[in-house]
């Protein structure tokens, strides 16, 4: 989860989020180098009155500043496209969970089980226990097995919502009448917090998401208890 005054992104807990962090650093370094070069050229132009006559109308220079930006854009686009394809690829999921957005709560259905479904509401501030997080705790957490490929089917019953868990690199729009899908796999156990990331009405800020990633034996015991 995020902390006050945090400068970077949340710690990656899925292969997709690790790729996104690498891409962020890669792109940020390119932007830093370009910005430094531009500032250096501007400072030279402001501090000297000399004119380089050989570059006033040079075909070679024009060729360079046409080809070089194209190479830079390609170096940014290729890793981005690779990650986009990885995010859309779903191979043999071990579990499928359907989540529906409502004003203003989430409902979940484990489609591989006959009768395993529940609603997930935010716990009001006055009912929080010591150590629990304001506006982020829910009455029913989504318990999932770690280190397994899980397919999430996301839709909405009323208006536009967005199901997002930043530390897992997830953000999928919940659109009425349309079923979107995404995949997740956590590399370590723990609680992962998210929120609705699409303004959906007056209580938009009160639609938290809590995923509890556990080892497979614990998940099997939980699913048996819930049914």
Curated annotation (Swiss-Prot):
Superkingdom assignment: Eukaryota
The reaction(s) this protein catalyses: 4 Fe(II)-[cytochrome c] + O2 + 8 H(+)(in) = 4 Fe(III)-[cytochrome c] + 2 H2O + 4 H(+)(out)
PROSITE patterns, per the entry: COX2, COX2_CUA, COX2_TM
Binding site for Mg(2+): 198
Pfam families named in the record: COX2, COX2_TM
Biological processes annotated in GO: ATP synthesis coupled electron transport
Stated name of the protein: Cytochrome c oxidase subunit 2
């Amino acid at each position: 989860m995020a902390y006050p005054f945090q400068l970077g992104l949340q710690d990656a807990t899925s292969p997709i989020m690790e790729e996104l962090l690498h891409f962020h650093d890669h792109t940020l370094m390119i932007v830093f180098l370009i910005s430094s070069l531009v500032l250096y050229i501007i400072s030279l132009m402001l501090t000297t009155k000399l004119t380089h006559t050989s570059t006033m109308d040079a075909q070679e220079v024009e060729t360079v500043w046409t080809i070089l930006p194209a190479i830079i854009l390609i170096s940014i686009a290729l890793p981005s496209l690779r990650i986009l394809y990885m995010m859309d690829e779903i191979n043999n999921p071990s579990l499928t969970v359907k989540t529906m957005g409502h004003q203003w709560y989430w409902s979940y259905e484990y489609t591989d089980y006959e009768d395993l479904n529940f609603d997930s509401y935010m716990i009001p501030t006055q009912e929080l226990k010591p150590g629990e997080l304001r506006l982020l705790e829910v009455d029913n957490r989504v318990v999932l097995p770690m280190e397994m490929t899980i397919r999430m089917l996301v839709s909405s019953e009323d208006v536009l919502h967005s199901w997002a868990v930043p530390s897992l690199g997830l953000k999928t729009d919940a659109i009425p009448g349309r079923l979107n899908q995404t995949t997740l796999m956590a590399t370590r156990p723990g609680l992962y917090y998210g929120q609705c990331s699409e303004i959906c009405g007056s209580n938009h800020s009160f639609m938290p998401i809590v995923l509890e990633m556990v080892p497979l034996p614990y998940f099997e015991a939980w699913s048996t208890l819930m049914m």
